[in-house]
Regions:
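N-terminal, intrinsically disordered charge-dense segments
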Residues: 23-39, 43, 61, 65-68
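Structured-RNA-binding interfaces characteristic of tRNA pseudouridine synthases
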Residues: 70-326
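Generic short amphipathic/hydrophobic targeting helices enriched at N-termini
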Residues: 23, 50-52, 70
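Glycine-biased, low-complexity coil/linker segments
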Residues: 1, 16-18, 38, 43-46, ...
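Flexible loop/turn and low-complexity linker elements, especially glycine-anchored beta turns
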Residues: 13-14, 64
Length: 326
């Protein structure tokens, strides 16, 4: 283990007891516990137990929390993929199986503790994820590159940790996000596939993807998206309905039509309503030219239907590069 270097105003020298030093000296695991009572500002405590949290001041005046047994509190950022079919959503719910609670069970099995986790999004029941990001603080010697394998051994097959890294102490997976990208999958065929019907919405009528693409471009930019917001949204209640979509496009591969949206944030059911509106355009019931008027109306009834959750995937979350630097 690398020794810790701290600046102390008064300290016991590790090379000679009774000598007082100023500035900095090295603290090794062997001397840390035995010399602790001589120099740690324990706020009234005289002899902390091994493994107890203590506060140590460094020479810049910052406070660093460390465990006596040599553990360090680190902020971990993980990337997850999950099948949302059997979950009530990501967020912990009082009556229902959530992705967050299931993940915390695995954390407790691996770390011996149950840290709070901060998810990048509150995906709804039945929504899937290809690149969900979450972070948590934990005291552990397990290096981040070994966390995926360790956690996956305790997770059900429909949740997988894909990657892990450390990030700055104040990093928050939700608030630090720059953009989030969602994918909505449509099976454009009269007959369902027996293999992956849980991962798309079937639209039997042939869709005009070129018209849908033209309409998708009307959503790009900064707009008030209240017309694409489901009832019960707290953002709508507070008048916070302006968002910026940086990319929105429609592609077809055979019978599969994909709608991909990237934005700085979303309203409740916004992507599912946007996808439903584009399907109305693809079916000829709306035109691309109607989209600006629908947005300007701020009227939910003028937009398309809310498509089912099962076709929606959180594809990826992007952060400013400096935010992900440990």
């Amino acid at each position: 283990m690398r020794p810790l270097r701290h600046g102390l105003s008064r300290a016991t020298s590790p090379k000679g007891r009774g000598k007082s030093t100023a500035g900095s000296f090295l603290i090794t695991p062997n001397t840390l516990a035995t010399s602790l009572t001589a120099w740690l500002p324990l706020r009234g405590k005289t002899s902390p137990a091994l493994g107890e949290d203590v506060t140590v001041g460094d020479k810049r005046g910052n406070l660093a929390r460390e465990r006596l047994r040599g553990f360090y509190t680190m902020n971990f950022l993980l990337t997850l993929a999950y099948d949302g079919t059997n979950y009530c959503g990501f967020q912990v719910q009082p009556n229902g199986r959530s992705v967050a609670a299931t993940f915390q069970d695995a954390l407790e099995a691996v770390l011996g503790s149950r840290p709070d986790i901060k998810g990048c999004s509150r995906t709804d029941a039945g929504v899937h994820a290809l690149g969900f990001r979450l972070n948590f603080h934990a005291d552990t010697r397990i290096p981040p590159q070994k966390l995926p394998l360790a956690l996956n051994q305790h997770l059900p097959p429909d949740i997988r940790v894909l990657a892990a890294q450390t990030v700055p102490e104040d990093f928050h997976a939700r608030y630090a996000a720059h953009t989030k990208t969602y994918l909505y999958r449509i099976h454009n065929h009269p007959i369902d596939s027996p293999f992956d019907a849980a991962y798309y919405t079937r639209v039997p009528r042939r869709l005009d993807e070129a018209a849908m693409q033209a309409a998708a471009q009307q959503f790009v930019g900064t707009h008030d998206f209240l017309a694409l917001c489901a009832a019960g949204s707290s953002a709508a209640a507070h008048g916070d309905t302006v968002r910026t979509i940086t990319d929105c496009h429609v592609t077809r591969r055979g019978d599969e039509v994909d709608i991909e949206v990237t934005a700085d944030g979303y309203l409740y059911n916004m992507v599912r309503i946007l996808a439903g509106t584009l399907c109305e355009v693809g079916a000829g019931r709306l035109r691309a030219a109607d989209i600006p008027a629908i947005l300007a109306s701020r009227d939910r009834s003028r937009a398309g239907p809310t498509l089912p959750a099962k076709g929606l995937f959180l594809k990826c979350v992007d952060y400013p590069e400096k935010e992900e630097q440990p």
